[in-house]
Amino acid sequence: MEVNKTTESLFSAKVEHNHAQAESHEPRDQRDVKVFSLGGKSSSKQEKLDHGSGRTSSRHETSRSSKEGSIEDKSAEVSSREEEEENRDGFLSGGNLTAGVAFTDTPMAVASEVMIETNAVTMSQIDLQWVEQLVLSTVESLLVADVDGKQLVEIVLDNNSTVPEAFCGANLTLVQTGEDVAVTFSNFVDQDQVAEAMQLVQQNPEQLTSLVESLKSRQLNLTELVVGNVAVSLPVLEKVETPLHMIAATIRHHDQEGDQEGEGRQEQHQGRQQEKKLEEAQI
């Protein structure tokens, strides 16, 4: 009996030793390590690790945000400095009104074109309504033509209060040949109207003289004035001779003499050439 007990005890001890060795291959730590903070609160090991990782990440985020903030602050400082420099170098820097203004030389061709365009615009702004009113109040029809090198203008005077009654409905014809101008009033209703128009012209010699002088100032000569079938005698303007006029007349006289001498010499030369040709033909 004692031997059996001893054997069983040894066997049980061996079995327990084998279990202990088997368990020793896989060691397990079942302890719960707790960390006590200064505030008197405790936390487990896993919570401590989680808290540590969160703190580390928060530190990284804080450092990253601080770096980004510093970069933004630096860029803001740089931009503010550039704005200050631009304001400092602006158009009114130091009270100089021309600071920052670029002066360029305009080519003469461009300047002349601009001047021509400005003049054209200025001319187009002139009020020509009075011309329209004059034509509408005095002219019924207008004809402008060029006949055999002569410029012809024919106007039918309107029956209006602005036109004298003796000339209402008559045709006014102007013919210009070089510097000479001929004026003709025609197509009257009857001979009585022709007589009235002729009488009106003869009773106003001052106006006729003024007409001749105004045409003369425009380098035009009134050579003929006809009312119906009657030619009006034109006033003769007194020629005022000045030293300049005398010099001009002398120059024209010398030019005419020189032209005549040149023509005579040319004729003599042509005659000699013809004589030579005849002699050569005879030989």
Curated annotation (Swiss-Prot):
Pfam families: DUF5421. Residues 1-96, 255-283 are annotated as: Disordered. InterPro entries: DUF5421. Residues 1-10 have a biased composition (Polar residues). Residues 14-34, 44-81 have a biased composition (Basic and acidic residues). Belongs to the chlamydial CPn_0705/CT_671/TC_0042 family. This is Uncharacterized protein TC_0042. It comes from Chlamydia muridarum (strain MoPn / Nigg). The lineage of its organism: Bacteria, Pseudomonadati, Chlamydiota, Chlamydiia, Chlamydiales.
